[in-house]
Amino acid sequence: MIRVAENDAGVTVAGHAGCGPPGQDIVCAAVSVLVQTLALSLNRLSPGETVYSMEPGSATIRYTSLSEKGRLLVCSFFVGIEAVAAAYPNNVTVTRRGSQ
């Protein structure tokens, strides 16, 4: 199960989808590309606002305040990640800030 969580400090992603062998798991690939795109886009389009780390099975994107552009990028990430979670509810969960 991949768990995506938003909190006041940023976004964390942890776990494995378990939908296929390593390198062939389409759910893991979808989540990975969305997370990497968010981190790289924030870094490039809103420089200085974020710090991120990525390792196999986990990623953390930290931010304390975001510009309007940065907030739009985060919202866009959640549109995509929530679509993946809706399509694969047994493999991906999403918790948004304020939704607990």
Identify the residue ranges that each predicted region occupies.
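N-terminal intrinsically disordered, cationic/polar leader segments
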Residues: 1-26, 33-100
